[in-house]
């Protein structure tokens, strides 16, 4: 029995090509786009990419997660000191999820290059999720933030964490909040080491959650203007709280706030 003939996808009308692309998972689309300049240009022309979501994670290993129309693809970049493993790829399927591991000497650099290509193919300027543990790649935090500043117009939901209390990430936190635009949600779960910590807090968020908010005193609270505000471990006194509530009720301050929780 002779092998099947290659399917001439590029000879199809564009609408038919687009239907073929809709049946592909995001990795298949990216792999197709890498074949030639022509396939790359065709890959960038699809009209349904607005339904795709792109998420970035920097925890134990950097990750790019792509939510397609049917499948969710996660690409992990795993640091390796084994020369034989450098560049190797492992893929596993689990239901709707496709897990892709890429072994690299410099996972952050590879993660950046792969992300730029993903953004180009799917014609994205903003990303849906950024989740970052600031104590994982401390020496590269500034480089990562500068990269995001140059390549991402905005982030819809951002979560920042600190796993090692002994590592001071105050400056990195402030630098990220000064340079990355956050549209909808900010979750901040880190320890504060400096009394003068005073980062920019985005305005008009749908939700602001700060789990160690000792640095947010009364005057700073008056500046917060988000729809839902949750502040844990907060030092505001009962007297200040009562004054704030009175101002809030008569709409003298924080007019966008609909829900406020202090602990």
Describe the role of every protein-language-model region:
Residues 1-263:
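Non-core capping and flanking segments associated with repeat-based/extracellular domains
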């Amino acid at each position: 029995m002779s092998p099947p003939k290659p399917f001439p996808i590029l000879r199809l009308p564009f609408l038919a090509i687009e239907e073929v692309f809709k049946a592909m998972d995001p990795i298949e689309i990216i792999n197709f786009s890498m074949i030639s300049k022509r396939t790359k240009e065709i890959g960038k022309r699809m009209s349904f990419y607005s339904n795709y979501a792109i998420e970035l994670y920097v925890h134990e290993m950097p990750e790019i997660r792509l939510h397609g129309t049917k499948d969710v693809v996660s690409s992990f970049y795993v640091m390796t000191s084994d020369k034989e493993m450098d560049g190797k790829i492992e893929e596993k399927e689990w239901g709707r999820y496709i897990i892709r591991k890429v072994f690299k000497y410099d996972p952050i650099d590879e993660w950046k290059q792969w992300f730029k290509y993903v953004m180009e193919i799917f014609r994205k300027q903003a990303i849906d999720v950024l989740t970052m543990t600031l104590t994982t790649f401390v020496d590269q935090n500034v480089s990562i933030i500068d990269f995001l500043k140059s390549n991402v117009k905005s982030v819809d939901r951002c979560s920042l964490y600190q796993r090692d209390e002994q590592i001071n990430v105050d400056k990195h936190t402030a630098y990220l909040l000064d340079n990355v635009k956050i549209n909808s949600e900010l979750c901040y779960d880190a320890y504060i080491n400096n009394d003068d910590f005073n980062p920019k807090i985005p305005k008009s968020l749908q939700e602001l959650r700060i789990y160690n908010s000792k640095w947010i005193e009364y005057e700073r609270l008056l500046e917060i203007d988000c729809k839902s505000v949750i502040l844990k471990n907060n030092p505001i006194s009962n007297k200040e709280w009562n004054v704030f509530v009175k101002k809030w009720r008569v709409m003298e301050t924080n007019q966008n706030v609909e829900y406020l929780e202090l602990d």
